[in-house]
Amino acid sequence: MLDKIKKMKNLLSIIVCLIFINALSAQTGTLGLASKAAIPNMMANPAQTGDARMIIGLPGLSSYQVEQQSSFKLSDWLNTSGGKTYLSFDKFAPLAQQRNDINANIGIDLFSFGMRIKKNNFFSIGVQHFSSVYMSISDDLVKLAAEGNGNTPSVVLNEESAYASQFNALYLGYSRNLMDDKLKVGFRVKRLQGLNHFQTDNVNFTLTTSQTSIPAYAVNVTGSMKAQAAGILGMATDSVLSNNLGSNITSNLTNMGNGMGFDFGVSYQVTDKLSVSASAVNIGSISWNKDFAGKVELVGTGKFEFSGITTD
């Protein structure tokens, strides 16, 4: 019993460290692939089923996946002084690249059930949720945020882009142990339910600052943006679809977009202390119902005034 408590303490310590590292690193992936002290993360590799004969997973207690990638490290923008750590805006502009990418992916088991039959066969069923967000911002936008618009009469923003998606997956999985348990292979077949999809096709804005409006800086904005949206976001772009959402909400939410996908994974125990594994997950596609997809197009001009921020 004490040994199990010690293992759980070690596991919690590792999780806390990973969360801290995630906030500072440019690229991280947090997965639990082969833990005997907790339910294994079959989400990352369907061949990794652990030693349990039966598993029941619920949100927060089973498989999870958290990944983030960026072209910069948050720790590069931190300063420490007087025992305090804070963001240094002075570092923003010098560290900005021509393109600054940010990508984040989250996956979680909403429910999972697995059972081992005759030692070598493992069957599983479950529901997973996945969310992903991607943004790309130019160094001009970073400099505008860090330095303000007072010293920059005109800024052209045409390299910005964004992508986001959400979907659920109902899966059936199978894994088998081979070669005296040294080799494990597994796969999952998924029924995909699309929830949201958004992507920009074209962004082109010009911000021009008036140098004569004192004390406020008047900013004129001209340009255009084209984007595509589907699912709940797609309905938000169409007033008719938005009004009809509540008329049959269950049917609408289950028929916005559907598709098929699969996962495949292998794991090989080279020695008692060394194992190697590989997997391909979330391979598939979703076809969106045209009644729940729309295009967003914004063309025009605008003007706003910024009088500054008062600080002590």
Language-model segments: what does each one mean?
Residues 27-312:
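Subset of outer-membrane beta-barrel
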